[in-house]
C-alpha cells in the first residue's frame, strides 16, 4: 500500500572540489559534461579523453541534445553524455536542456552520476549546475506505484566534479522536495487521496513544520466570501 506522503530524503549529492581528472571520472558510472557551444582546444586538453570528445563533437548535428555520447577509458567504461550550451539562456531552457541530458544518462543501470560544467563564467556555471542538480533530483526520486515490485531507481547518488568552490544548493534541494511532494500527491488516485485524506496530509505537514492548521467547512467559506474556494469545496460530498 502506498503511503499518502513520500519520503523526502532525496538523493545524496556530493560536491568534489578540484580539477576534473581521470580518477574522479572513474568513480562515476555516468557523467554529464556540459561545455560551451564552441569549446576551445585548451579546455578540451584539460579534460581526460579530450581528444575523443573533440572528435565526437565534430560529428554532432547542430542543436542536438545531447551533443555527443562517448565512453571514458576506465574500468567502469563510464558513459559520458556531452551537452553544449551558451550563457544567458532562460531558466526554463536550462531545465529543459538538463532533462534531456539526464534522460540520455539514465538509460543504463542505476549508478553514481557525475555532473561537470566546464568552460563558463562563474554565473553561467552556477546556473547550469543548479539546473542539472534539479533535474537529477527530480529523476532520482520515486513516485507512487501499484506494483508488487517497485521500479529500480535511475540514480543512486550524484557527484559534482571539477568545482572551484562548494555550490549553494539549499534552495535547489528545497524546491526539489516541494516538487516531489506535489508530483506524488497529483499521482495518487481519488480513492486514496479523498477530501479527508488530503486534510490529514496537510495537517501532518503542518505538525511536522510547526505551522498552524485550520480546516474550513462550506458554511465558514460562505461567511468569509471565499467564492473560488467555495466553488471547489461544493464539488465534494464531504463538507
Where are these regions (language model features)?
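Short amphipathic alpha-helical segment within the helicase RecA-like ATPase core
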Residues: 1-239
